[in-house]
């Protein structure tokens, strides 16, 4: 029996290795369109490969996976983050869980993952062919695949693990086979805020911020980094993921509301500010930073509120207090465009989960055609969750394929 795996990335290699272990007699070939395999793994986590997460801070799966949580809830019963941890350690890759719950190789080097995968593939007899771009696929009793427009091969089964496609046209061949395609759009990006003085605070971090998309219920909390182009950091990346499709529809022009202190209850903030006034009446406002925010950020807020920096707290007045409360909790910025995140490219969209059997990752319209990884309409916030989805869906597909062909 033969199977072609289209895409030499994380999901493709993980599927191939596990399939070959479960069904050694299956002939497995990985086809990669570029000259190098596992290129996205190489840059994951800034070159350190954030390969999973402890999930300790995830109360409900949809907070990590804005799209695909229902499929993964089922799939995690077979292979979850704990299984991932054990799998890699058993493969000779010691792991470490950071304070932020992100899981990395102890070596902090993504190349260790790449070397391990290539070594295992070689030992298991998996064939890897680079510079093979799939140009067509025809279904029948067997699948006929055409590469580079002139090389034809036939296989008993095919697994598509090509990752996220930036354009729907790249998925047209799957649509022709009867699959519903969700328009792919970026889902992890930073916010460009041109012509705003906030960019002068480049490098300033608000450790506990909350950012919401104005006019919606979408919001996220976490650390916010001010950059020379606008805003980045975990809270921005989360919000970009939660609102990926809506933000795309707005053509990346929208307003955000920032609570620099992760608090929007004006009464609570007023009580706190009034306590500062009582305790520091003769001190200059600029010298007492509320909520321990950065002094540079505090100066920015005072300038925006048009409050003189040499004014004393006792002279602030009710109007001044209200201005500060509003800017601490509800500071508005206009976003014009998006930026990339560490050269990583994650999309929402792809093959609709309506077209997939959750138990097996098999196509509902084509027997012996399987999917794994970001080609599916599954994506996550930053923190190792996207790679975990790749490992899980690849493992589920490997088990399903092995069970079918071992039974023949």
Where are these regions (language model features)?
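A glycine-rich dinucleotide-binding beta-alpha-beta segment and adjacent secondary-structure elements
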Residues: 130, 299-379
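Beta1/beta-strand and adjacent pyrophosphate-binding region of the FAD-binding site
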Residues: 1-11
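A conserved short coil-to-beta-strand element within the FAD-binding core of flavoproteins
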Residues: 130-143
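Glycine-rich FAD pyrophosphate-binding loop
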Residues: 4, 20-46
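An anion/pyrophosphate-binding glycine-rich loop and adjacent beta-alpha core
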Residues: 35-37, 43, 51, 55-58, ...
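A conserved FAD-binding loop/helix module that cradles the flavin
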Residues: 161-177, 377-406
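Short hydrophobic core segments
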Residues: 4-6, 31, 134, 152-165, ...
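Glycine-rich active-site loop/strand segments that organize a redox cofactor
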Residues: 46-97
């Amino acid at each position: 029996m033969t199977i072609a795996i289209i895409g030499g990335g994380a999901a493709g290699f993980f599927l191939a290795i596990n399939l070959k272990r479960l069904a050694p007699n299956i002939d497995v070939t990985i086809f990669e369109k570029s000259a190098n395999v596992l290129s996205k793994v190489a840059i994951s986590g800034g070159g350190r490969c954030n390969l999973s997460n402890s999930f300790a801070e995830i109360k409900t799966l949809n907070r990590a996976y804005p799209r695909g949580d229902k499929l993964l809830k089922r799939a995690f019963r077979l292979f979850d983050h704990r299984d991932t941890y054990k799998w890699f350690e058993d493969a000779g890759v010691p792991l470490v869980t950071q304070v932020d719950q992100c899981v990395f190789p102890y070596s902090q080097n993504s190349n260790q993952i790449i070397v391990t995968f290539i070594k295992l593939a070689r030992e298991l007899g998996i064939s890897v062919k680079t510079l093979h771009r799939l140009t067509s696929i025809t279904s029948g009793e067997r699948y006929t695949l055409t590469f580079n427009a002139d090389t034809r091969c036939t296989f008993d089964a095919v697994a598509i693990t090509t990752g996220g496609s930036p354009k729907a046209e790249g998925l047209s061949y799957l649509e022709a086979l009867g699959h519903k395609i969700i328009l792919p759009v970026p889902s992890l990006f930073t916010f460009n805020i041109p012509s705003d003085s906030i960019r002068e605070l480049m490098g300033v971090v608000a450790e506990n911020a909350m950012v919401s998309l104005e006019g919606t219920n979408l919001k996220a909390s976490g650390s916010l980094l001010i950059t020379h182009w606008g805003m980045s950091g975990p809270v921005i990346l989360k919000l970009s993921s939660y609102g990926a499709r809506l933000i795309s529809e707005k053509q990346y022009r929208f307003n955000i509301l920032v609570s620099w202190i992760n608090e929007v209850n004006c009464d609570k903030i007023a009580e706190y500010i009034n306590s500062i006034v009582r305790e520091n009446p003769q001190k200059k406002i600029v010298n007492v930073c509320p909520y321990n925010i950065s002094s540079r950020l505090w100066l920015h807020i005072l300038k925006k509120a048009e409050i003189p920096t040499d004014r004393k707290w006792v002279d602030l007045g009710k109007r001044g207090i209200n201005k500060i409360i509003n800017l601490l909790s509800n500071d508005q910025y206009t976003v014009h465009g998006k930026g990339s995140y560490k050269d990583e490219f994650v999309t929402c969209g792809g093959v609709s989960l309506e077209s997939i059997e959750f138990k097996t990752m098999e196509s509902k319209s084509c027997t012996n055609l399987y999917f794994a990884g970001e080609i599916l309409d599954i994506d996550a916030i930053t923190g190792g969750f996207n790679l975990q989805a790749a490992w899980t869906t690849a493992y589920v597909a490997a088990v399903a394929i092995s069970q079918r062909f071992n039974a023949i």
